[in-house]
Regions:
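Contiguous segments within soluble domain cores/interaction surfaces
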Residues: 2-122
Length: 122
């Protein structure tokens, strides 16, 4: 049975916890923090890699919008369209706090055939 992209994603949602649903060719990748204060970041990098582990996109703290308890990056349409339609990518967030504490978060990115990023799964 062939599931449409939307149905596949609904099925996946039942299996794993969602970080954020992002729709469109200029998606916003959003991370919310409950313990760490993003204002204390001295460095933060968002890295997207393809299935083979090749880095295809990297954004730094200068590209981020830092909220009270969150950090987010907006991908440009060109960046999103540069990803392979229907492809699977991994996304890693690494950060360093003023006191030297380090942290990381890993997630899978799923692209639908029309190059819209529909969801981030952790």
């Amino acid at each position: 049975m062939h599931l449409t992209c939307e149905k596949r994603l609904l099925h996946k949602r039942k299996e794993k916890k969602m970080v954020r649903i992002i729709i469109g060719t200029t998606p916003i990748i959003h991370y919310a923090f409950h313990i760490v204060d993003p204002a204390d970041f001295t460095a933060a990098f968002l890295t997207i890699k393809d299935a083979e582990g090749t880095e295809v996109l990297r954004k730094g703290l200068d590209d981020a919008v830092i909220g009270e308890d969150s950090i987010e990056w907006k991908l440009s349409q060109a960046e999103t369209l540069g990803l392979t339609p229907g492809g699977k990518y991994s996304m890693m967030l690494n950060w360093v706090l003023e006191d030297g504490t380090r942290g990381a978060s890993y997630a899978d990115l799923l692209l639908c055939d029309d190059n819209h990023i529909r969801e981030v799964i952790v």
